Amino acid sequence: MALSRLSVLCGVREGRALFLRTPVVRPALVSAFLQGRPAQGWCGTQHIHLSPSHHSGSKAASLHWTGERVVSVLLLGLIPAAYLNPCSAMDYSLAATLTLHSHWGIGQVVTDYVHGDAVQKAAKTGLLVLSAFTFAGLCYFNYHDVGICKAVAMLWKL
């Protein structure tokens, strides 16, 4: 029953789906678009440049983006490792990576949504202070109390 409904939706006739016989985009248009020239029947006049600009961006921006991805992947492995082996090294690693990950994420929100030079500088300064206090607070909690891993385990036991 479900297959017959699916065949009606997909336009199956004689064992072949309708979308397999009907091209969505004509190859000539794609070829012309990639070569940067308009084709017959192409009404768009906007050009999209696929090659990277040598004038925009820098090596530092590329390294920053790579660093963000490394920290995100590191967190994916660090959280289960902290659950399986709670120790002070895991606590301090979590404190550093969570603070850095949060700092970069909220920094992007500030960059995207806070407008005006003075306001944006003040927001970024406030974020830097907040991140420093967050890291210091987590380190203080790790040193003087049970630590992040054991605190989460205690919350789960409630």
Curated annotation (Swiss-Prot):
Localization annotation: Mitochondrion inner membrane
Protein name as it appears in the record: Succinate dehydrogenase [ubiquinone] cytochrome b small subunit, mitochondrial
Subunit-structure text: Component of complex II composed of four subunits: the flavoprotein (FP) SDHA, iron-sulfur protein (IP) SDHB, and a cytochrome b560 composed of SDHC and SDHD.
Mitochondrial intermembrane side: 85-89, 142-158
Membrane-traversing stretches: 63-84, 90-110, 120-141
Source taxon at top rank: Eukaryota
Transit peptide segment: 1-55
GO cellular component: mitochondrial inner membrane; respiratory chain complex II (succinate dehydrogenase)
Entry's family note: Belongs to the CybS family.
Pathway recorded for this protein: Carbohydrate metabolism; tricarboxylic acid cycle
Function: Membrane-anchoring subunit of succinate dehydrogenase (SDH) that is involved in complex II of the mitochondrial electron transport chain and is responsible for transferring electrons from succinate to ubiquinone (coenzyme Q). SDH also oxidizes malate to the non-canonical enol form of oxaloacetate, enol-oxaloacetate. Enol-oxaloacetate, which is a potent inhibitor of the succinate dehydrogenase activity, is further isomerized into keto-oxaloacetate.
Gene3D superfamilies: Fumarate reductase/succinate dehydrogenase, transmembrane subunit (1.20.1300.10)
Organism field: Ovis aries
